[in-house]
């Protein structure tokens, strides 16, 4: 299936003439410029165009944690001028189709790494900064699937499915439901073609984030039906955490007991070796799930311990989408116990993190906090409520 060619470059502006030195020798103002280029808040200028396809490929090849600053340093080296010597992706594709087996293997590995990279970049960047590049990536996969030797078809179908699940998620974040549904169909076809039904588990898990209550729980339970009897432990841990979270939202006290199962699965898991989408799962994210469950159950003692663990796992300069969710949960807990000033502080932090990445997911998570603020008469709380509502309207998000 051809999905439509997207522009290769996202654009931005040049750095000021007198950069401020940073601790690693990279001008701090250059990093700021690149961040604004990638996120898309500056006007076009060819000198700071960022090749998102190549950025995703490089990030996908990294093994281990990548913080926001590392991502920006890589992007700083991939402006249009710096990436000019790299072959156009369509030229690489033509060579792959007509070249040797080694050429073909290299191209398949490049596409697999790039899919992983897009999943990793999603933690840090707004959906709008990635969507066109990801659809262009899917175009390459589509073309290669039509022409590649049979021995590569299953691998290409797997990575196409992994990419399509992310494209569906980004389309949902960008309020494009028809495109999101189309990518769901692509991922379903890829799961069937590759004989990797686990791809469907990811699709249904992503759907659960857009739902509430019983429908959200049912989406997670549908996802679990695609798990194998053994293995895929990172995905298993993620789905079990989501199930506990939604059970807690429904007031089911068994949710706290259910947290033991994902911990056991996580101990067996190898998130950086399993699936493109499992790279996000680490000890910090597991702590964030525990916090979310205990907040929903109103367990003040457990919230304190889980909150401290989640906060200690945070990289102060990274994963702002995760930050938005953690801060929102802590804010909700503080508002529940009547600590309004601390609650307001964390709501403000959550809102700032969600705005920074234009995260619909983060704003969705702030829905319960919005309801708690609505019952407050404190002037600061009322002002913050107004900011939340205006931000949600500006980004087109509905409250949870």
Model-identified regions with their sequence ranges:
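Conserved binding/catalytic microenvironments
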Residues: 94-400
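Short amphipathic recognition helices of helix-turn-helix/homeodomain-type DNA-binding modules
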Residues: 1-91, 386-393
